[in-house]
Amino acid sequence: MHRQMRRIKQQLSHEAAVQVMREATSGVLALEGDDGYPYAVPISHVWTDECLGGEDEFIGRIYFHSACEGYKIDSIMDSEKASFAVVVRDEIVPDEYTTYFKSAIATGRVHVLEDDEERLRGLRALAEKYNPGQQESAEKEISGALSRVAVIAFEVEELTGKQARELASREAKASRVE
């Protein structure tokens, strides 16, 4: 599955790529859709450091929530392979004919959670990210919606991050100064 990044100097460290995933408020989940065509859907998410040991090891987990039926759920049920891309910076620089960007892409396996404890863990993580410090109202919302919402777990097997070479150059200069 892994391919070497062509522009290696623009590659983010694993820790920086995780930070990009944490900071992003939305991304695009890519699945295999009907007739083998890609299906990509914008969606809110939360990155967690949960992982398994042993042969099923993965490097992080991303949670999403969704309606219980629809194209996204059908696609997940048909194929567990997926990717998820986020962009936290996308600054157009007209004078340089470029953009200053910072992004990350996760590749792994996705599934709809059945266990209520796992579903609650995912919904609580989403609530804390998007409504920090509102635990009481979040619990009320979650308990009222639990039977009507699907919670999706994306087990990240590979994570890569990339940034514009201009940003990489700035960061390299800054670290030499320190």
Residue map of PLM features:
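Charged, gly/pro-rich active-site loop segments
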Residues: 2-7, 89-178
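A generic structural signal for nonpolar/aromatic side chains embedded in well-ordered alpha-helices
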Residues: 21, 75-76, 126, 154
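Short gly/pro-enriched beta-turn/loop segments at secondary-structure junctions
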Residues: 22-24, 79, 146-149
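Short beta-strand segments
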Residues: 24-68, 84
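Broad gene-expression machinery/nucleic-acid interaction feature
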Residues: 26, 40-42, 81-83, 101, ...
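Structural motif
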Residues: 51, 61, 81, 109, ...
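Helix-adjacent hinge/juxtasegments
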Residues: 64-66, 71-99
